[in-house]
Amino acid sequence: MNSSDLKNDSYLSIEGVSKKFEQFQAVRYTNLKIRKGEIFCLLGPSGCGKTTLLRMLAGFEQPSEGRIFLDGSELTGIPPFRRPVNMMFQSYAIFPHMTVEQNVAFGLKQDQVAKDKIREKVQEALELVEMPKLAKRKPHQLSGGQRQRVALARILVKQPKLLLLDEPMAALDKKLREQMQLEVVDILEKVEATCVMVTHDQSEAMTMASRIAIMNEGEILQVGTPSEIYELPNCRYTAEFIGTVNLFDGTVIQDEVDHVIIQSPVLKHPIFVDHGITGTEGMSVTVALRPEKISMASKPPKKPHNCATGIVQDIAYFGSHSIYHVELETEKLVYVHLPNPERGASHATWQDKVFLEWNPHSCVVLTH
């Protein structure tokens, strides 16, 4: 890795940061390195510490311990108005008595930028968010998506080194939220913005972020790309928090370099995984298996492992796919995600006996 790569890897550096409110530990000894130009997401449930961490980046809260660096300069202790950081709040915080262009220009006027320069920068920002024709409108004359674009233009117009987005899609309905997720990413990528966003919405994080940090009870449990977080969770909490997952608790009965065999009390056949875990025989583990990794048939497979028999108890129809709730002979409920057949074809239905199987590389072994 060359020196420029090292610099990019630590454009925003959070080093040993903790935050305590009296007896409550909101953020616990956090270390993060965020690259220049990436959209980084703090994802977790309400109360996990993600917003507190974001507020420390903005300067609204000061760390109890630790230091924060941006582009080589320390931010710790610097007040919000002196930081090269802009934040878009969940409510957008647009001034209702101002027009679109006045809202976008507000921060520049506060900084006493020359009028000609303000006019030029506001026009550029409105063109970036595709709203130059709405410059004279008031917020009440705009749709939810348009108000969000105004808020985005207002934080982009000052060209900050770091953008902070607090639950950016929370005020939008589902359809508009899905549309705006991609639009916002496109805008941020055009200006090569470095952005940290906070959300509790898994699909929002998976759609928008280049990397995600999973948070719970003030701690970061895993950092990775959306595919790494989904396909290779490092703990039970992450596996359950992202998407739907089947979990099988079991015991290691054989662990070799190229495979591990696990026996679960809820499965009649052992689970074979095509990689070792450097564990020991008798070790307790959990196997994570995503519903779309399981195939379902009306005839039993001819294999000694990675299979189960059950009865279809429920079917959730989602148009392009259905999720089958299959109760095994041991009363364990397993979720199976299958694409819906073409019109006229058929899948299993309620109370059908079905046979499940999965590949050795589809499982993830969790040791904690």
Whereabouts are the PLM-identified features?
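ABC ATPase nucleotide-binding domains
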Residues: 39, 80-86, 90-240
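The feature captures the beta-strand-to-loop junction immediately N-terminal to the Walker
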Residues: 43-45
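Helix-to-loop junction immediately C-terminal to a conserved catalytic motif
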Residues: 58
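Conserved coupling/switch loops of ABC nucleotide-binding domains, chiefly the family-specific signature
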Residues: 64-67, 117, 217, 249
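Conserved ABC transporter NBD signature motif
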Residues: 66-74
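Non-catalytic connector elements of ABC transporters
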Residues: 245, 255-368
